[in-house]
Amino acid sequence: RDYLENYYRPNLRVKSRDGLTPISPNIVPKEAIPDPHNLALRTFVNGELRQEGTTADLIFSIPYLIAYLSDFMTLQPGDMIATGTPKGLSDVVPGDEVVVEVEGVGRLVNRIVSEETAK
């Protein structure tokens, strides 16, 4: 339990705020992804590449994550497992455009807004 508290909870607090967990503009069937274990991942901030990696770089493999989570929760078709991002943190400020790409899945574009603007 300590591991989960310390390893996963900070990411959940940062990346899963109410109304602020954008996932993808597309739903892609598994048949459209030839190798989910080696998809390119990229993040751009204002057009500048800030993160780059692949799903092969994940700390835990996709089959391991599915097996691990299945031990204590029921996974259903269509469920999403959030794993984090490639190395390279990037500060963003209101007005910045963040683009995230997953090879074969698509590209998600978001603009950062202030809390006051979001209300």
Which residues does each predicted region cover?
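Catalytic-core "active-site belt" of small-molecule-metabolizing enzymes
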Residues: 1-72, 88-119
